[in-house]
């Protein structure tokens, strides 16, 4: 349908989608809105009332078709249109809506070890000061009460990466060849090759080489929690800066300062890993044959 995407990055969260969005936008064959994660197909015509920390991420999603089309209004004629909303893989409603509006759309999903993905999501939430619990194991134990209270899907750490269940919904509506599935390990091992595969899949020039020098959306823990709070939460200084500095520039500065304040900490608590393997192990075992990959390493 004219004015709607030719391709979608549907997931997964914390699996390099921010970087892919940046790399694909550099291609002269492609137009992607600067607004990553509009989430339209997850929430079309929904009255959004998400609660809990960081609820604005969901509540500010694009829900009207006219607003969604407007995201692509600046594209040149004949160019490929696309967007990246990792929530589409998670959303039960997204596959049906995508099939209705853009049945021929090409899709890409990068899947990360769900145990690592869940912990990375937790670190992301602590980085942006929206996770009120410092211990990951305790956060996992609070999942059900948080979901029942209407908190945003991010806080369903072990619910978010149920890839086999999620792909079932897509394969019920689309030919498998329409969805390119790769893993986060593929991205880390050969980002140039992965980009070429994605470009070829969506119909762009696969020989295009993007600038991949900037590290994006890295996780970790804050070295100085008070400084991280200052950066991420509204206060008189940040509000004053917001009055004179454009939002895009302000967010770039904030994220760079936040990255400087982060330290790599990949030590997942053993109790948390045990909980995740119990919850997600059957999903991993089913996913491997589904996508034709040996994922036994994800169970270790």
Where are these regions (language model features)?
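PAPS-dependent sulfotransferase catalytic core
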Residues: 1-85, 100-110, 114-147, 174
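The conserved 3'-phosphoadenosine-5'-phosphosulfate
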Residues: 35-36, 168-274, 293-300
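Active-site rim elements
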Residues: 52-56, 85, 152-161, 182-185, ...
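PAPS-dependent sulfotransferase catalytic domain
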Residues: 60-75, 129-211
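Short beta->alpha connector loops
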Residues: 86-90
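A short acidic, amphipathic alpha-helical/loop segment
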Residues: 94-97
């Amino acid at each position: 349908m004219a004015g709607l995407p030719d391709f979608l990055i549907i997931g997964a969260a914390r699996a390099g989608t921010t970087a892919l969005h940046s790399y694909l936008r550099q291609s002269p064959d492609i137009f992607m809105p600067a607004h990553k994660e509009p989430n339209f197909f997850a929430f079309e015509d929904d009255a959004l009332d998400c609660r809990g920390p960081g609820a604005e991420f969901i509540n500010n999603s694009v829900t009207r078709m006219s607003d969604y089309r407007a995201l692509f209004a600046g594209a040149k004629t004949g160019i490929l249109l696309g967007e990246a909303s990792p929530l589409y893989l998670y959303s039960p409603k997204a596959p049906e809506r995508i099939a209705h509006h853009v049945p021929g759309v090409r899709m890409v999903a990068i899947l990360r070890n769900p145990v690592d993905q869940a912990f990375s999501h937790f670190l992301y939430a602590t980085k942006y000061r929206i996770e009120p619990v410092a211990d990951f194991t305790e956060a996992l134990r609070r999942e059900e009460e948080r979901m029942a209270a209407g908190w945003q899907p991010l806080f369903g750490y072990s619910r978010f990466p149920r890839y086999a269940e999620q792909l079932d919904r897509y394969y019920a509506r689309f030919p498998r060849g329409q969805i390119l599935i790769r893993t986060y390990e593929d991205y880390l091992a050969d980002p140039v090759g992965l980009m070429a595969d994605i470009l070829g899949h969506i119909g762009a020039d696969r020989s295009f080489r993007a600038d991949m020098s900037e590290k994006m959306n890295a996780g970790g823990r804050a070295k100085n929690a008070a400084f991280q709070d200052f950066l991420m939460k509204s206060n008189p200084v940040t509000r004053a800066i917001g009055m004179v500095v454009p939002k895009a520039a302000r967010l770039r500065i904030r994220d760079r300062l936040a990255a400087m304040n982060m330290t790599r900490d990949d030590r997942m608590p053993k109790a948390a890993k045990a909980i995740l393997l119990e919850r997600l192990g059957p999903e991993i075992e089913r996913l491997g044959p589904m996508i034709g990959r040996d994922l036994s390493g994800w169970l270790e």
